[in-house]
């Protein structure tokens, strides 16, 4: 059964821009020097600030730009929660997953993301991991072409059928 996605995601038109979207619910300053040293450009959410520093553009969580940034991202670097990961797959975005420590669901999500060839997982971002991820973007993009993105009708039909069987 495919994931249920919010309508705002289903309405988006995915493009492949230049920026990599970084989304962290808890700021981790240790990743900033790694991102700065990279030749890529990043749009970063989760550091409770806005502004630009070299190749990094900071935006606050809840920004009105978020959905547009997600739709136009070249790739995603984020924790491995189900919602964002599902949205990224729907939009065919390669994903570097940083599962939250001791969160089994996130570790499992990240494991399968990597196993299916849609991205990589790592416990901690390093320059080597980032370089490896960036070098494999075209491989992940090609693999994502085989992902069968669906609207919510299939999932809702399965849920309706299951509820009727239980009643």
Residue ranges and their predicted role:
Residues 131-167:
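C-terminal amphipathic helix plus adjacent low-complexity
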Residues 47-89:
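Donor nucleotide-activated moiety binding/catalytic core segment of transferases
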Residues 84-85, 89-141:
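Catalytic binding pocket for nucleotide-activated donors in carbohydrate/polymer assembly enzymes
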Residues 1-28, 48, 65:
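A nucleotide-sugar donor-handling region in carbohydrate enzymes
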Residues 31, 65-67, 130:
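Acidic, amphipathic alpha-helical patches
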Residues 24, 30-61:
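Catalytic donor nucleotide-activated moiety binding site of glycosyltransferases and closely related
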């Amino acid at each position: 059964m495919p994931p249920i996605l919010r309508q705002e995601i289903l309405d988006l038109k995915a493009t492949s821009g230049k920026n990599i979207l970084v989304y962290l619910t808890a700021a981790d300053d240790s990743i900033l020097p790694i991102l700065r040293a990279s030749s890529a450009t990043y749009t970063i959410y989760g550091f409770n600030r806005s502004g630009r520093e070299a190749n990094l553009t900071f935006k606050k969580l809840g920004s009105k730009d978020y959905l547009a940034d997600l739709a136009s991202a070249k790739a995603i670097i984020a924790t491995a929660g189900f919602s964002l990961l599902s949205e990224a797959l729907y939009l065919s975005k390669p994903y570097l997953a940083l599962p939250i420590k001791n969160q089994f669901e996130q570790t499992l999500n990240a494991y399968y993301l990597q196993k299916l060839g849609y991205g990589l997982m790592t416990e901690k971002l390093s320059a080597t991991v980032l370089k490896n991820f960036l070098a494999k973007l075209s491989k992940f993009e090609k693999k994502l072409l085989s992902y069968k993105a669906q609207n919510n009708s299939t999932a809702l039909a399965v849920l309706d059928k299951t509820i009727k069987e239980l009643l």
